Regions:
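Residue-level signal for transmembrane alpha-helical positions in Major Facilitator Superfamily
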Residues: 18, 22, 34, 70, ...
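N-terminal transmembrane alpha-helices
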Residues: 8-40, 44-45, 58-73, 77, ...
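Transmembrane helical elements of multi-pass membrane transporters/channels
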Residues: 19-38, 139, 173, 213-217, ...
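Short runs within selected transmembrane alpha-helices of multi-pass transporters and secretion channels
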Residues: 71, 139-158, 166-174, 205-221, ...
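Short alpha-helical transmembrane segments in multi-pass integral membrane proteins
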Residues: 1-24, 78-145, 187, 192-253, ...
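Alpha-helical transmembrane segments of multipass membrane proteins
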Residues: 36-40, 110, 118, 152-156, ...
Length: 467
């Protein structure tokens, strides 16, 4: 017992947080680095190629985040079961994730392939690149089953405290992607005096490279899960277990609606930006890619926050929850101040990595420096949301996120760009206002203590004692 208490003293907790967070951060860093490489490789072909790849990226977020929401339901269930020491209950969740992968993967494969030719039109993509964007989109969604496996099985492993395996699979996926990009995007050419084979497929080559790497990653993480000592679904019946699915769905459904609603907002946001022309679309696409690297500390810490909060709730340890909140928020804000400062200082250098167009670079630098200032505030909302996910409270984040996205970002951007004829800078100003609103809502809810079910339980017990 004393050993357990010592391990959750502040510096012991820092070690625990970082042990869970660093593999996710490293995985995100690798993934973002590959996005950078992808964008740079495609950008070398020309601005049209960059726009074709980036024009449908928000739809990718929409689908990817909806699948990820299913994983959040299992994360809450398994992390709480592990915190309570109930390994049997945690193991039962594994076969249900297999069902989730099969259902989600098959559904989104059929849906997205059927809609691939229509998505660029709905996104107001320039008619000159609509066919190319549609082909890219079709190829990217062919291996959706494998993509669902990477997302959901990866979340399952993290919730049991294994963040390194998803990281290794992510490294493999991204490494294969880079190598295949090099071989498939460009034609056969001379590199350092040597003839290097190239398929010369351009944007299509980038899509094929991504699809193949997803298949490899999906197979690998499935094999790892089948061999896992605690979570292997081997020997379990592949049928719905409602004792597991009901609590998972109670958490997953609001989170799925939140992600779907906010991602649909991203689609509407990007659609309005696409209507501003090729320069604005390219600058927005590249700036988004650059910005994503500087959110890595935030989302890495969110994974640790969700897992540890779920563990603490499962163990019934309210002191640990409070200590976790104080410590992880301090670490998060510190990291986001550093990352925001770096983004502000090096915005021109980052934009020049991906574009040679002076207009695209200048516009991208402006919006990146604007958003850099808001990063520490956004970091607070990321962490509080993560802790609430681990606790199984996903309704409040749903309400806050939808209100911010549609009430501030979308309405504001529509007024600025579509009615007043303003440009990309005004759209990003609306995005920053959205992030600041999230900070106020999540920080206020955290301070109130209502997000923690153990606080509510203690309050009820106090009232009963007084009676």
């Amino acid at each position: 017992m004393e050993k357990s208490k010592r391990s959750f003293l502040p510096w012991g907790m820092v070690s625990t947080i970082l042990t869970l967070a660093w593999p996710t951060m490293l995985e995100e860093l690798m993934q973002t680095a590959v996005q950078y490489i992808d964008t740079a490789m495609v950008g070398a072909i020309g601005t049209q190629a960059t726009a074709a790849v980036g024009a449908t990226s928000t739809v990718n977020w929409l689908i990817g985040s909806t699948v990820a929401a299913i994983g959040v339901g299992f994360l809450s269930f398994v992390s709480q079961a592990c915190g309570a020491g109930d390994t049997k209950r945690a193991g039962k969740a594994s076969s249900q994730t297999v069902l989730a992968v099969l259902v989600c993967g098959t559904f989104f494969t059929v849906l997205m392939l059927a809609l691939s030719s229509k998505v660029p039109v709905w996104m107001q993509v320039d008619p000159a690149i609509q066919d190319l964007a549609a082909q890219y989109f079709f190829i990217l969604y062919t291996p959706m089953l494998a993509r669902a496996a990477i997302t959901i099985f990866g979340t399952l492993l993290r919730s049991a405290g294994d963040a390194k395996t998803p990281m290794r699979v992510g490294f493999l996926v991204n490494g294969v992607n880079v190598v295949l990009n090099f071989l498939l995007i460009y034609p056969t050419r001379q590199v350092w005096g040597m003839t290097v084979f190239g398929a010369g497929w351009g944007v299509i080559g980038a899509a094929v490279a991504s699809a193949i790497s997803f298949v490899i990653g999906g197979v690998c993480i499935t094999v790892v899960l089948w061999r896992h000592p605690l979570l292997s679904p081997k020997g379990q019946k592949l049928r719905p277990d409602w004792d597991v699915l009901k609590p998972c769905l109670r958490v997953a459904l609001p989170n799925a609606l939140q992600r779907f609603g906010t991602s649909l907002g991203y689609v509407a946001f990007a659609s309005m930006i696409n209507s501003l022309g090729e320069i604005a679309t390219a600058a927005h696409t590249i700036a988004n890619t650059v910005e994503s690297a500087f959110y890595i500390p935030g989302y890495g810490m969110q994974t640790a926050a969700a897992t540890l909060a779920g563990n603490a709730l499962g163990a019934g340890d309210n002191r640990r929850v409070k200590e976790l909140g104080r410590m992880i928020l301090f670490i998060e804000v510190s990291l986001m101040i550093v990352s925001g400062s770096l983004l502000f200082l090096f915005a021109p250098n980052m934009m020049r990595l991906f574009s040679r167009d002076a207009q695209v670079i200048a516009l991208g630098v402006t919006v990146l420096r604007m958003v850099a200032v808001s990063e520490p505030f956004y970091g607070v909302s990321i962490i509080v949301e993560g802790m609430m996910q681990g606790m199984g409270n996903t309704m409040m984040p749903f309400v806050c996120s939808i209100a911010g996205m549609w009430g501030v970002r979308i309405v504001g951007t529509f007024i600025c760009t579509q009615l007043l004829g303003m440009g990309l800078v005004s759209a990003w100003a609306c995005m920053i206002a959205h992030n600041l609103l999230l900070f106020l809502l999540f920080a206020g809810y955290y301070i109130s203590g209502k997000w923690n079910p153990m606080n509510r339980k203690n309050a009820v017990q106090t009232v009963k004692t007084a009676d």
